[in-house]
């Protein structure tokens, strides 16, 4: 049987010398590019144990190359993670473009979105959400999408959907309604877009309440966008709506959206562009 130190010696790789490398005055191999050692001496009390007096070491350029490779690998893993979160979190590919970077800077409420992302840990701990309410086309969904995209870039899981899709999924699910709702509540942040546009049947209202109440009991924040007014939410027409609206107002801070209709402006811009093309 070989002595243990011989086996240890075999595990120490030899340094590969490049043509430009050289031996320094201390007897160690130096990199010809960065002029730093590619070897280092063992402490005197370890040299006999390992059967040799030196071991490989990273020169400065090798260290820089390794760190560059590690950073590139880390960035690749981050991109893959974010891509997976967006694939799972968004119900419409267009939502990927609803970002702070693409914002036109004309929505005065955008500061509330930045605040939410910057204080996410506090929002999560306090179970604080937003109720984004106001007229059609004022940027509510876009702002909610900005929050979702920004948090996903931080590798935080978000689900952005609407009750029309949820009700369709519940009607078609084979896993059970409770399990489906539980899956929604596993997301650190749930965003419900276009609330109030779903069909108001007894079954539909019951499922809407189940989702919102389950989210409430999960202790996780919720963001909702709606065209309903705050007065309509505070003074509901009947008991089923009152149960739902009370839960929302308890969980979410109201944020009013008013002003210009960005969708109408976008449509007008397209019409003007079409007229210009036809006249060219």
Predicted regions and their residues:
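Active-site donor-binding loop signature of nucleotide-sugar glycosyltransferases
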Residues: 61, 105, 163, 257-259
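Residue-level preference for the first positions of well-ordered beta-strands
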Residues: 127-131, 158, 189, 221
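Walker A/P-loop nucleotide-binding motif
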Residues: 124-144
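Short glycine-rich substrate-engagement loop in P-loop NTPases that contacts/grips substrate
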Residues: 108-117, 148-189, 199-206
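N-terminal pre-Walker A segment at the start of P-loop NTPase domains
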Residues: 98-123
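Walker B catalytic acidic pair
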Residues: 194-195
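A short, basic N-terminal segment
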Residues: 1-104, 265-280
